[in-house]
């Protein structure tokens, strides 16, 4: 693509650029590369190499590779050259400890239509869900984080004090839902959709749940209020 000074690893149907990203890069660089594709009329999909595979935590860089669909929520793609497979990590959520919860679909190389596979998050499909037990040890974890002066938890405690509350007195049930949608203070480079209503629907859905002994994670389409 001489017009934007970039070389895609693969083009699909002359409108979708596939980029294999094997190592970390500055978020600002990723944002610029994504924007350049968009302005040239191309959609770009990032396939993450081994060093960037999703592990226990969602880094700030990972968040800039996230895509979003109502049927599969936040998701990203991993390329595994050793196992000869493409992996879709979807329904990506974070708990209050910062740990990732998600589901995975595996696509062996050479099986199926590549474009159909890449379109799967946006295709009509049977919807998946993920069930997680209540984190009963969360209050102790939060007390520990405050003791060691974790900046994030100290900031939340300051907010809590301003409302006349104290994080240390909250029970595990009062923290429900423990597992939440990813958030990014700088937005998401790959997502143009305004997610305000998605977050609102999520909060309202779990605010109405009476059984707080478990949390069932659904695709965002499930949280949408009936018209």
State where each predicted segment sits.
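Conserved catalytic cores of phosphodiester-cleaving nucleases, focusing on short active-site segments
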Residues: 8-26, 37
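Residue-level detector of flexible, active-site-proximal loop/helix-junction positions
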Residues: 24, 51, 83
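Active-site-adjacent loop/helix micro-motif of nuclease/hydrolase catalytic cores
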Residues: 21-33, 54-55
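Non-catalytic C-terminal interaction segments of nucleic acid-processing enzymes
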Residues: 63-227
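Nucleic-acid nuclease catalytic cores
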Residues: 40-76
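A broadly used, surface-exposed interaction patch
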Residues: 1-5
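Basic (Lys/Arg-enriched) interaction patch that binds polyanionic ligands
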Residues: 27, 33-34, 39, 43-45
